[in-house]
Amino acid sequence: MQTIIRVEKLAKTFNQHQALHAVDLNIHHGEMVALLGPSGSGKSTLLRHLSGLITGDKSVGSHIELLGRTVQREGRLARDIRKSRAHTGYIFQQFNLVNRLSVLENVLIGALGSTPFWRTCFSYFTREQKQRALQALTRVGMVHFAHQRVSTLSGGQQQRVAIARALMQQAKVILADEPIASLDPESARIVMDTLRDINQNDGITVVVTLHQVDYALRYCERIVALRQGHVFYDGCSQLFDNERFDHLYRSINRVEENAKAA
């Protein structure tokens, strides 16, 4: 099976606090993987490294590869980082949309990387690009809102627009950082259904950070759980049982309680 994401010996330190400890990880084509862990476990930090939003420590041998291209090596971004980012869709917890633009215009932003510079200066998109944007909105059930200002949408609707933008980008990998953290249960279900649909029907690799273990078990075949910057579990979601759950979360709570008591 083709390896889409390769992480070797990744470490990250923030102000003398080590957030990641020599993490190794391989993710294969077509997988839908959940990154789990308590707050501060390093899951979002790991995800941001995958597309080079942040760089790791200058550790000997550290290396991140995405879609066959080096993203960063020993704390330095690759010079051609834009080439790997061009096919990587990143979905943020806070949507990262332009509120003053319409839904359709926000989705068209996904085409900027493949659009000649002079056309981007005038926000000129071809009829074919606009048609593809409408098709992407149809896929996520948002085509009827195409000409509505994005600021008028609910959080769940905005998150689906962000997914449509990734489809417009023709992403081969989608990295979703807590995409349902601020959503009500029904909106969260729709967003996760949408991510699973494009994973299963388009073959797009999806890596998603989640706090909700039940969603990880329901939607992702593989779980990578982090605990204090270490990979605690990496395997089939069906084998992530109550004992592992308790050890991952309750032991962290005891550490926090002891620290407060001290």
Swiss-Prot record:
Belongs to the ABC transporter superfamily. Phosphonates importer (TC 3.A.1.9.1) family. It is found in: Cell inner membrane. The gene is phnC. GO terms for cellular component: plasma membrane. It holds the Pfam family ABC_tran. Keywords: ATP-binding, Cell inner membrane, Cell membrane, Membrane, Nucleotide-binding, Phosphonate transport, Translocase, Transport. The keyword Lipid biosynthesis does not apply. Its main location: membrane. This is Phosphonates import ATP-binding protein PhnC. Residues 5-253 form the ABC transporter domain.
